């Protein structure tokens, strides 16, 4: 079947392959202005702990080149700017112009200048040279990508030998009771919060559905191996609600 005739998941809905990117863009154009507030409300602030653990595992040092992919409002990029110093460089990249604008304004206001660039790019075809980055992170972005295999291969291409990829993403709870409670919360509370805070319940309904459709921990681990990464491991956080996958390029 050609890509033009293929369908893919947009939450629980099947849509033509080429339409998913447009629909996801609509979601994030809608929520960009309130994205940070909603993250704090939805996760009770725990997303900050998940991101802190990701940064701690990154191995980023002074002078490194770092790509924060699907970096949105720049939580990780801000910390990486401090870690790489003026000898290094951070690229905050997102496919969504609204998210990128919010991130640029936020980081500029926090004094993050001189060693950061902002690049609107599609993860499936990254516009960077081969073997360029010491570290790549993608935080809560992979599940929104249409062709995840192609995106992972693109990340592997632009990563230096010896570099690492960190994928922080919602995953599958490993405790049955937690899974049931989490599903109830996701499908009822998230759209309700979206309606109250952003006047957009549908975008947060998609969020809940996209989490359910995202590959589980073992499947994503194998996808990273298939894309060319080695020594892939993952760490469950908050009972598997979130998982951090780390893979290396040798």
From Swiss-Prot:
Binding of S-adenosyl-L-methionine, residues: 73, 94, 122-123, 139
Keywords noted in UniProt: Menaquinone biosynthesis, Methyltransferase, S-adenosyl-L-methionine, Transferase, Ubiquinone biosynthesis
Entry's Gene Ontology molecular function annotations: 2-methoxy-6-polyprenyl-1,4-benzoquinol methyltransferase activity; demethylmenaquinone methyltransferase activity
Q: What is its EC number?
A: 2.1.1.163, 2.1.1.201
Q: What class of enzyme is it?
A: transferase
A Pfam family for this UniProt protein?
Ubie_methyltran
- UniProt pathway annotation: Quinol/quinone metabolism; menaquinone biosynthesis; menaquinol from 1,4-dihydroxy-2-naphthoate: step 2/2; Cofactor biosynthesis; ubiquinone biosynthesis
Entry keyword 4Fe-4S: no
Return the SUPFAM superfamilies for the record: S-adenosyl-L-methionine-dependent methyltransferases (SSF53335)
Question: Which GO terms are recorded in the biological process aspect for this UniProt protein?
Answer: aerobic respiration; menaquinone biosynthetic process; methylation
Q: Which reaction does it catalyse?
A: a 2-demethylmenaquinol + S-adenosyl-L-methionine = a menaquinol + S-adenosyl-L-homocysteine + H(+); a 2-methoxy-6-(all-trans-polyprenyl)benzene-1,4-diol + S-adenosyl-L-methionine = a 5-methoxy-2-methyl-3-(all-trans-polyprenyl)benzene-1,4-diol + S-adenosyl-L-homocysteine + H(+)
Is Transferase one of the keywords?
yes
Q: Extract the InterPro entries matched here.
A: SAM-dependent_MTases_sf (IPR029063), UbiE/COQ5_MeTrFase (IPR004033), UbiE/COQ5_MeTrFase_CS (IPR023576)
Question: What function does this protein fulfil?
Answer: Methyltransferase required for the conversion of demethylmenaquinol (DMKH2) to menaquinol (MKH2) and the conversion of 2-polyprenyl-6-methoxy-1,4-benzoquinol (DDMQH2) to 2-polyprenyl-3-methyl-6-methoxy-1,4-benzoquinol (DMQH2).
Belongs to which family?
Belongs to the class I-like SAM-binding methyltransferase superfamily. MenG/UbiE family.
UniProt name for this protein: Ubiquinone/menaquinone biosynthesis C-methyltransferase UbiE
């Amino acid at each position: 079947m050609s890509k033009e005739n293929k369908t893919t998941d947009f939450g629980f809905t099947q849509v033509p392959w080429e339409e998913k990117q447009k629909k996801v863009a609509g979601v994030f154009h809608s929520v960009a202005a309130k994205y940070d507030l909603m993250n704090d409300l939805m996760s009770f602030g725990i997303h900050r702990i998940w991101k802190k653990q990701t940064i701690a595992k990154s191995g980023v040092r002074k002078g490194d080149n770092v790509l924060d992919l699907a970096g949105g409002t720049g939580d990780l990029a801000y910390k990486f700017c401090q870690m790489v110093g003026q000898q290094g460089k951070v690229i905050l990249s997102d496919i969504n112009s609204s998210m990128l604008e919010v991130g640029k304004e936020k980081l500029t206001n926090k004094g993050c200048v001189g060693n950061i660039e902002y690049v609107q790019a599609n993860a499936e075809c990254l516009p960077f040279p081969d073997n360029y980055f010491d570290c790549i992170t993608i935080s809560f972005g992979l599940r929104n990508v249409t062709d995840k295999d192609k995106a992972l291969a693109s990340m592997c291409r632009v990563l230096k030998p010896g570099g690492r990829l960190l994928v922080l993403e919602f995953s599958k709870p490993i405790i049955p009771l937690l899974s049931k409670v989490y599903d109830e919360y996701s499908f009822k509370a998230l759209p309700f919060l979206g309606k109250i805070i952003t006047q957009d319940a549908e975008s947060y309904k998609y969020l809940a559905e996209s989490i359910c459709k995202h590959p589980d921990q073992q499947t994503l681990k194998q996808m990273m191996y298939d894309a060319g990464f080695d020594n892939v491991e993952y760490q469950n956080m908050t009972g598997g609600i979130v998982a951090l996958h780390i893979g290396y390029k040798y």
